[in-house]
Amino acid sequence: MSQIFNFSSGPAMLPVEVLRRAEQELCNWRGLGTSVMEISHRSKEFIQVAEEAEKDFRDLLKIPSNYKVLFCHGGARGQFAAVPLNLLGQHGKADYVDGGYWAASAIKEAQKYCTPNVIDAKTTLNGLRAISPMNSWELSDDAAYVHFCPNETIDGIAIHETPDFGDKTVVADLSSTILSTPIDVSRYGVLYAGAQKNIGPAGLTLVVVREDLLGHARKELPSILDYTVLAENDSMFNTPPTFAWYLSGLVFKWLKEQGGVGELDKRNQAKADLLYGTIDSSDFYRNDVAVANRSRMNVPFQLADAALDKLFLEESFAAGLHALKGHRVVGGMRASIYNAMPLAGVKTLTDFMIDFERRHG
């Protein structure tokens, strides 16, 4: 079978080395004669998996010791509710930065629990979609926290600035960027990410929370979303998604073998440069996001003649380039190039794009 490159926005491509190891171990994990999916989450064997995964994740992100790491259910949408219910305390207000679809979704959920101060950061620059700089955001003095999403997967818009808001508690949805570039965890109060883009399969959510933010949950908060309950029970208040946890642990080890987040950051930049360079050098393709706010993970692009979209998708799929159809809100194409996507995959895509333009432009 020829090489297939999966450009899905999530669930996304996983490292082939990880998939092969999981395949080898699937029915007889560590010589136990059973699958890792079948053993108790409280067995010493799985506890070792869980502890190794947390240690590797901490090493990769350089997480300070005064932060808890939680392995949760519920995805980012679950965290849209968990964040306000855990952090608001007696506050009635939180700052929410609206940079696109997912930020707006977090705002909609937060409105059930508080009155968000919404900062609309969407703007245009020379006719291109952009995000206003952080120093222009009008934050509240009395907000419990400020929430933003650094990367909008649908719009292909990213906020590359590092937050510097003094002593404000900063919360970030890193679902599509986690482990793709180094970050200073100490700048944040809470980080959360669905696993299905840069970590592992769907079903697992990672939360990193500063310890001083624990213990302030609203009384109506379900225990399964309570950061304090999860921390006190080592993320095993109920049965966790064990197979997703195991596979994510394999991905963490793969990332360390590749050289860590710093090395992946270089690779991700090279992939993005190649793809955007191909788009920008052509009149046949276009990207409508200002250069300073272009996403390195999700690259939307349109053809000059939308009537060719269907043919582009058919021919690219036949060439082993899968899941390139853009989101219905934006249209066109979208290439998601997370950590597991090799440079060779992006090169295959750009070669196809150049050839398609030659034949149909």
Curated annotation (Swiss-Prot):
- Write out the catalysed reaction: O-phospho-L-serine + 2-oxoglutarate = 3-phosphooxypyruvate + L-glutamate; 4-(phosphooxy)-L-threonine + 2-oxoglutarate = (R)-3-hydroxy-2-oxo-4-phosphooxybutanoate + L-glutamate
Q: What is its main location?
A: cytoplasm
The beginning of the lineage is: Bacteria, Pseudomonadati, Pseudomonadota, Gammaproteobacteria, Enterobacterales
Question: What pathway does the annotation place this protein in?
Answer: Amino-acid biosynthesis; L-serine biosynthesis; L-serine from 3-phospho-D-glycerate: step 2/3; Cofactor biosynthesis; pyridoxine 5'-phosphate biosynthesis; pyridoxine 5'-phosphate from D-erythrose 4-phosphate: step 3/5
The membrane-spanning stretches of this chain are none
Pfam families of this UniProt entry?
Answer: Aminotran_5
UniProt xrefs under PANTHER family? PHOSPHOSERINE AMINOTRANSFERASE (PTHR43247:SF1)
Enumerate the subcellular locations listed in this protein's record, separating them with semicolons: Cytoplasm
Spell out the protein name for this chain: Phosphoserine aminotransferase
Q: Name one GO cellular component term.
A: cytoplasm
Q: Which GO terms describe its biological process?
A: L-serine biosynthetic process; pyridoxine biosynthetic process
Listed under subunit, the entry gives: Homodimer.
Molecular function GO terms recorded: O-phospho-L-serine:2-oxoglutarate aminotransferase activity; pyridoxal phosphate binding
Q: Which cofactor does it need?
A: pyridoxal 5'-phosphate
- Positions bound to L-glutamate: 9, 42
Residues at which pyridoxal 5'-phosphate binds: 76-77, 102, 153, 173, 196, 238-239
